[in-house]
């Protein structure tokens, strides 16, 4: 028996990032990686957002985040906007606080209808915090390349943690590279002991960046909120952009602000409801891991 048997779910998207939201606040039973993979086979998604009972005073829920391969993620900005939309519906609150593996996240109604803002917390730059497999004193750009030594295809990425590891490669044209081919190679590179999200980014001007991302555990996606945050921060660290930028992703636009006063990163964008349904228990009948996970 799965904790997801007969549970209501909402299929949503955050500028094209495919999200499934399930409210399990009345159900403390755990959801397994095998359950998460079974859901992905039935309702394709990039991230599965599970609202579990709150563990800390002042929070609405503990949000557990699964990628579609059954691995867990500490952060998903687009998914949190979808969660915020669901929780704000029928509520007169202007702000909500959630706990995730990456820490506390605050969400607000955005500056216009249909927009939501998520405080993604502080970025981390230390090589052990990202983490990397070896020491780099300066993570603004590290020595890493793919392709021939004398003519690398991609090289010298910036690395950042936004609760999950990110590597950003600066390019002239984000569509000129086969990210579906290079993404999994770089995601699983030995330098990233916990794997990494891989982004190709082009700085248009000081207020605008275009980007594409291969998401750790999900593959090519139309949008990755934490990658947009990491990319904006990395560009500002290199002094190539201002601290507030517009991000163009395949699925749409995000506004990212890296605040001076507290070092927190704010992400603002849309969240769309698509449909809702209920999980058939038969979906999880064979969802067993040989490890028992």
From Swiss-Prot:
Ordered alphabetically, the record's keywords are:
Amino-acid biosynthesis, Cytoplasm, Isomerase, Lysine biosynthesis
Catalytic activity, per the record? (2S,6S)-2,6-diaminopimelate = meso-2,6-diaminopimelate
> According to the UniProt record, what class of enzyme is this?
isomerase
- Residues with site note (Could be important to modulate the pK values of the two catalytic cysteine residues): 166, 215
UniProt family annotation:
Belongs to the diaminopimelate epimerase family.
| Record-given protein name | Diaminopimelate epimerase
What quaternary arrangement does the UniProt entry report?
Answer: Homodimer.
NCBIfam families hit by this protein:
DapF (TIGR00652)
Instruction: Report the locations given in the UniProt record.
Output: Cytoplasm
A Gene Ontology cellular-component term: cytosol
For this protein, the Enzyme Commission number is 5.1.1.7
| Gene Ontology molecular function | diaminopimelate epimerase activity
Q: In which pathway does it act?
A: Amino-acid biosynthesis; L-lysine biosynthesis via DAP pathway; DL-2,6-diaminopimelate from LL-2,6-diaminopimelate: step 1/1
Q: What does this protein do?
A: Catalyzes the stereoinversion of LL-2,6-diaminopimelate (L,L-DAP) to meso-diaminopimelate (meso-DAP), a precursor of L-lysine and an essential component of the bacterial peptidoglycan.
Question: Which annotated residues bind substrate?
Answer: 17, 47, 67, 77-78, 164, 197, 215-216, 225-226
**GO BP annotations listed:** lysine biosynthetic process via diaminopimelate
Active site residues according to the UniProt entry: 76 (proton donor), 224 (proton acceptor)
């Amino acid at each position: 028996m799965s904790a997801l048997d007969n549970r209501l779910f909402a299929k949503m998207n955050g500028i094209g990032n495919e999200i499934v939201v399930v409210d399990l606040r009345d159900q403390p039973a755990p959801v397994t990686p095998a359950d998460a993979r079974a859901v992905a086979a039935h309702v394709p998604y990039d991230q599965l957002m599970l609202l579990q009972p709150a563990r800390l005073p002042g929070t609405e829920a503990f949000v557990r985040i699964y990628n579609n391969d059954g691995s867990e993620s500490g952060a998903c900005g687009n998914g949190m906007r979808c969660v915020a939309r669901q929780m704000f519906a029928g509520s007169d609150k202007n702000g909500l606080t959630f706990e995730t593996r990456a820490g506390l996240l605050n969400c607000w109604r955005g500056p216009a209808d249909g927009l939501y803002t998520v405080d993604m917390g502080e970025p981390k730059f230390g090589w052990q915090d990202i983490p990397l497999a070896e020491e780099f004193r300066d993570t603004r750009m590290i020595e890493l390349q793919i392709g021939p030594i004398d003519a690398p295809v991609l090289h010298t990425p910036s690395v950042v943690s936004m609760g999950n590891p990110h590597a950003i490669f600066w390019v002239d044209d984000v569509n000129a590279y086969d990210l579906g081919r290079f993404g999994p190679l770089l995601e699983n590179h030995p330098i990233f002991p916990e794997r990494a999200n891989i982004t190709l980014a082009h700085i248009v001007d000081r207020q605008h960046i275009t980007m594409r991302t291969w998401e750790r555990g999900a593959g090519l996606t139309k949008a990755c909120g934490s990658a947009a945050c990491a990319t904006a921060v990395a560009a500002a660290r290199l002094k190539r952009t201002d601290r507030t930028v517009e991000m163009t992703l395949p699925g749409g636009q995000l506004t990212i602000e890296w605040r001076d006063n507290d070092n927190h990163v704010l992400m603002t964008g849309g969240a769309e409801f698509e449909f809702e349904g209920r999980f058939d228990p038969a979906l999880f009948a064979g969802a067993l891991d040989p490890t028992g996970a």
